[in-house]
């Protein structure tokens, strides 16, 4: 919270749903108290969640649209491999099949995940230690140019970093050298974003409406977009000013190591979050950032939140045809896509 100059929220936000607008739009969400149990009793929590979902739907089946979110499955994929969870996924399939058959052909169903999972055994990235060894202070408020604040969002493959604006580039120089760091992203003075690795630098710009994008890189191309722009130019799909359309970039990068990177970075820079981070850090597979207390309870076999494909790409299936690849914002029901400002 920049106005109060302190980190607010924490684990209780997840449990309470406070200041999480999308939860208010759901007809079913895993109860807050139940979101604390999966790391202690994952399978029992999961099957209980399926039962609550089934009961809630049958009580509200007359609604024209029923929106549900199963939160326990996220924890399951942090703790187990996909192969280990196959019976649990089949149980979910049975619940959905039962609901669908009860609709007697009059019910449409859309299932999707909101992200992927690296499925790589993961450990904490020593970012805090790295910064402190280089003279930075990791704390809950920002007073001086060497102060850094990094909220803990669970255990995920990214870190949101807050600092004094004048310290951004120097801090980015330090972050790219930290163990486990893959990409460092921050807004630049040209109105776009700079993407850094330890061996390369990229600059991304976009038009006001987001329909056109420009990209350049020096050293090793951090987003692997130069080859994409070169191919689009050869196909005559770049404008005279060297920009690529948003649609062309999505089509060309949806299956890349960094899926749809231009739009995802642009959305970070322009999205509805009031207290946007000064720097985003995307971690390599095998690393996470977050509340360290969880590391003493369980071993993580995977996580999500990073830019790379396994953490990013989810699935979607439905009773109506879907395209081979689609952004989540284009997939979600209209009832869900009402934007609200949040802190």
Locations of the language-model features?
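Loop/turn elements at helix/coil->beta-strand transitions in domains of secreted/extracellular proteins
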Residues: 62-64, 105-108, 180, 276
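Short secondary-structure boundary/capping segments
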Residues: 81-86, 122-132, 200-202, 296-298
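Acidic, His- and aromatic-enriched active-site or binding-groove loops in soluble protein domains
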Residues: 1-10, 86-98, 127-144
């Amino acid at each position: 919270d920049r106005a109060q100059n302190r980190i607010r929220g924490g684990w209780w936000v997840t449990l309470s749903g406070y200041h999480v607008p999308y939860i208010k739009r759901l007809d079913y969400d895993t109860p807050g108290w139940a979101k604390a149990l999966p790391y202690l009793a994952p399978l029992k929590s999961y099957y209980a969640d399926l039962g609550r979902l089934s009961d809630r739907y049958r009580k509200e089946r007359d609604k024209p649209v029923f929106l549900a979110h199963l939160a326990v499955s996220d924890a399951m994929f942090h703790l187990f491999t996909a192969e280990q969870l196959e019976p649990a996924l089949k149980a979910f399939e049975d619940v959905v099949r039962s609901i669908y058959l009860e609709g007697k052909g009059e019910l449409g169903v859309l299932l999707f995940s909101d992200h992927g999972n690296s499925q790589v055994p993961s450990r904490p990235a020593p970012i805090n230690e790295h910064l402190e060894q280089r003279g930075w202070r990791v704390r809950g408020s920002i007073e001086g140019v060497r102060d850094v604040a990094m909220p803990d969002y669970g255990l995920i493959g990214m870190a949101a970093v807050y600092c004094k604006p004048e310290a951004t580039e120097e801090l980015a120089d330090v972050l790219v050298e930290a163990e486990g760091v893959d990409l460092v992203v921050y807004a630049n003075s040209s109105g776009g974003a700079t993407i850094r690795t330890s061996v390369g630098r990229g600059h991304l710009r976009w038009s006001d409406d987001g329909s056109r994008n420009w990209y350049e890189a020096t050293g090793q191309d951090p987003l692997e977009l130069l080859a994409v722009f070169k191919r689009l130019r050869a196909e005559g799909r770049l404008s005279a000013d060297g920009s690529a359309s948003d649609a062309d970039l999505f089509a060309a990068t949806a299956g890349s190591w960094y899926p749809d990177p231009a739009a995802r970075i642009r959305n970070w820079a322009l999205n509805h979050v009031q207290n946007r981070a000064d720097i985003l850090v995307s971690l390599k597979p095998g690393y996470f950032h977050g509340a360290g207390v969880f590391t003493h309870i369980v071993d993580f076999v995977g996580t999500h939140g990073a830019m790379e494909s396994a953490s990013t790409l989810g699935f979607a299936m439905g009773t109506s045809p879907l395209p081979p690849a689609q952004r989540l914002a284009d997939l979600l029901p209209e009832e869900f896509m009402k934007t609200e400002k949040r802190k």
